[in-house]
Amino acid sequence: VTNFNTAQPIAQPASGLTELVLTQGTSQSWQMVLPMIAHLSRQCGQRWLTWVTREPVPAQLLANFNVDTSRLRLVHCKNDEQQLWVSWDALALGNSHTVIASPGKLNKREFEQLERAAQLGQCQGLLIRER
């Protein structure tokens, strides 16, 4: 039994992956994701918040949500396969606090590879997908 009155917070969040599932075709995807990105951009310390995306992200949109772009690294990819491997590299390198990506549908092996990369880089991964 944990005594929450005396329990100490964890100094570093555990590495690993989190999935966020959005309804396909919704025009409010930006409104769901950007507040999280803004929060994470202010929590990353000396490490990057890396966002791997296929779509260009307008600078004004980032400004509207108060994203700290001085700690945000945007990486644009051409397709799901490229996004998968860029995400793996960003997770494994260890210079990102969190890597956000939408690599498309992943099989079990690909998901496990990303999990191992996050552990190797002591990094959080946020995978966004649509259903």
Walk through the language-model features, giving the residues of each.
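N-terminal targeting/trafficking signals and adjacent low-complexity tails
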Residues: 2, 14-15, 43, 93, ...
